[in-house]
Amino acid sequence: MASSDCEGHAGQEGETFLYFAYGSNLLTERIHLRNPSAVFCCVARLQDFKLDFGNFQGKMSERWHGGIATIFQSPGDEVWGVVWRMNKSNISSLDEQEGVKSGVYVVIEIKVSTREGKEITCRSYLMTNYESAPPSPQYKKVICMGAKENGLPQEYQEKLKAIEPNEYKGKISDEMEDIIKKGESKLS
């Protein structure tokens, strides 16, 4: 995957910002649903954090029928993800998708490292007040497809594949089913 220019800031300079995705927004089709300006910038690593899945205030996600991705500080661990360059006009749609107004996630500014070791500052999200819970098989699949699509390190992809999902076998929203189908056809 060709790398776009990753210069920039998570904050208020210029007309774009950098967003570090580690969950369902790893998959291009998923992020483009609400944030069409997103352009792949690079694969990056968030040091001293760990990936987790949970239900905000103990309530399962109605969209995904299981725990959704979050990160927490954990010395020695790392989370791999994708840095997307986005127009500032998409900040509100990204915040809405992440449930910022309702308190599901809070906006954080983090420093991530590219494969070349360059440090860049990005906007990201962290879930507050959650109980750990496994993801649905469908949600896990979207994350794994996004990791594969964008070439996250193979060892990290194997860790993602090893995550035990819950046993949900029902349907998820048509919109999410569509992004899974599009992702599958692109990756096959």
UniProtKB/Swiss-Prot annotation:
Per UniProt, the keywords (alphabetical) are: Lyase, Phosphoprotein
Q: At which residues is Phosphoserine found? A: 173
Report the EC code(s) recorded for this entry: 4.3.2.9
Report the catalytic activity: an alpha-(gamma-L-glutamyl)-L-amino acid = 5-oxo-L-proline + an L-alpha-amino acid
Q: Which GO terms describe its molecular function?
A: gamma-glutamylcyclotransferase activity; protein homodimerization activity
One GO cellular component assignment for this chain's record is:
cytosol
Question: Which amino acid positions bind substrate, per UniProt?
Answer: 19-22
Q: Which residues form the active site?
A: 98
Q: Which GO terms describe its biological process?
A: release of cytochrome c from mitochondria
Q: What class of enzyme is it?
A: lyase
**Record's keyword annotation contains Phosphoprotein:** yes
Q: Which SUPFAM superfamilies match?
A: Gamma-glutamyl cyclotransferase-like
Family indicated by similarity: Belongs to the gamma-glutamylcyclotransferase family.
The entry describes its oligomerization and partners as: Homodimer.
User: What role is this protein assigned?
Assistant: Catalyzes the formation of 5-oxoproline from gamma-glutamyl dipeptides and may play a significant role in glutathione homeostasis. Induces release of cytochrome c from mitochondria with resultant induction of apoptosis.
This protein is called Gamma-glutamylcyclotransferase
Source organism (scientific name): Mus musculus (Mouse)
Q: What's the encoding gene here?
A: Ggct
